[in-house]
Design a protein with these regions (language model features):
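Conserved AAA+/SF3 P-loop NTPase catalytic/coupling segment centered on the Walker-B
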Residues: 125-150, 164, 181-188, 200-208
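AAA+/SF3 P-loop NTPase mechanochemical coupling elements
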Residues: 118-127, 156-173, 184-185, 190-193
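Walker A/P-loop
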Residues: 59-96
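Dynamic helix-loop-helix/coil hinge segments at AAA+ ATPase domain boundaries and subdomain interfaces
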Residues: 27-51
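C-terminal engagement/docking regions of AAA+ P-loop ATPases
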Residues: 23, 27, 265-349
Length: 349
């Protein structure tokens, strides 16, 4: 049998303390860098704090966003500002009815001088992609984008090409103009990590937007833009690993599962919930809820997930994954109201 001497025990204890201190300082530094990025985004996207936080949650959880809101709410600006703060490139794609899959993925170009074909990569090979008004393009174009999101690769001809490891898509939908649109099927919507709803800013925020716009015009004239610390891709990948190591109590894992199962078996909880729900969420929703709750806890400088984290991201994770019944639509019930009711019925384990 092996016995530890007091000297060896103290050495091991000291070394473990040093390792723990190093890990803790590394996590703190990563959170500090993300806090700086969050402040940069907040300075650029005024009056939308929830939008800013959820953009970072998607980045940390390695997922994609669909954003619904009226035009002019800085959706393009948000992704552009995010690209400025990251070691990443950015491309905006305006979806239109005449768009082709090759306009996204790229195409093989013929070279007459040697009779060969050379692949010209499309905009999907950028790190950050804004798919503006995704519901204006036909289904085959939407499918090309969603294949890239789900598989991290695109297929052109007989060849498959890998997309960058850092790859985030933010798709937008305009809730006002619905003529000439191609709504995404529920199975395709499920590929998005979160569905965000953004609204107009209040009067105070709009005044701040005016001042920001004037200040930027002067900055462009004077060529005096402030420098910003750029997060490297390796720092982002390290932060994602830290997020996966966030502690979640078994009781909270059970709570998440109960919330999702309640959308599939609403009759066990409440007649009202049962009458409002046509279809519930898939296991992909449970995975998304877990990843987003962990990312939120990490952003709030905690090494554990709380019930508040789960409840804070629930609406964005489930909004596009549940289907309301005809009765709910007739009563004017929204997805948000249904999810509020769901939270009131399912208790924390």
């Amino acid at each position: 049998m092996f016995y530890l001497t007091s000297t060896l025990y103290m050495m091991l204890k000291h070394n473990l303390a040093k390792i723990y201190s190093y890990i803790k300082s590394k996590v703190s530094m990563a959170i500090e860098h993300f806090s700086t990025l969050k402040q940069h985004l907040s300075d650029q996207i005024i009056g939308q704090p929830a939008f800013v936080e959820n953009l970072l949650i998607a980045l940390l959880a390695n997922g994609h966003l669909i954003v619904e809101g009226p035009p002019g709410l800085a959706k393009t600006r948000a992704v552009n500002a995010l690209a400025e703060g990251l070691e990443a490139d950015f491309h905006r794609i305006q979806f239109t009815p005449d768009l082709l899959p090759a306009d996204l993925t790229g195409t093989d170009t013929y070279r007459p001088e040697d009779g060969s074909f050379v692949f010209q990569a499309g905009p999907l090979f950028q790190n950050l992609v804004l798919a503006d008004e995704i519901n204006r393009a036909p289904a085959k174009v939407q499918s090309a984008l969603l294949e890239a999101m789900a598989e991290g690769q695109v297929t052109v001809g007989r060849k498959t090409y890998q997309l960058p490891e850092l790859f985030l898509v933010m798709a937008t939908q305009n809730p006002i103009e619905q003529e000439g649109t191609y709504p995404l099927p529920e199975a395709q919507l499920d590929r998005f990590l979160m569905h965000l709803e953004i609204n107009y800013p209040d009067a105070t925020s709009e005044l701040a937007i005016l001042k920001l716009n004037r200040g930027e015009a002067l900055t462009d004239v004077n060529h005096d833009k402030p420098t910003l610390r750029v997060l490297s891709q390796s720092e982002i990948f390290d932060a994602r690993k830290q997020v996966l190591n966030i502690h979640m109590a078994p009781s909270l894992e059970a709570y998440m599962v109960d919330l999702i199962i309640a959308t599939r078996q609403p009759e066990k909880y409440d007649d009202k919930l049962s009458s409002w729900l046509a279809y519930g969420a898939s296991p992909r929703a449970t995975i998304a809820l877990d990843r987003c709750a962990r990312a939120r806890a990490w952003l709030h400088n905690r090494d554990f997930v709380s019930p508040e984290d789960i409840q804070a991201v629930l609406h964005n994770v489930l909004r596009h994954r549940i289907i309301l019944s005809y009765q709910a639509e007739a009563e004017g019930v929204t997805s948000n109201q249904l999810l509020d009711h769901l939270l009131s019925l399912v208790a924390v384990a």
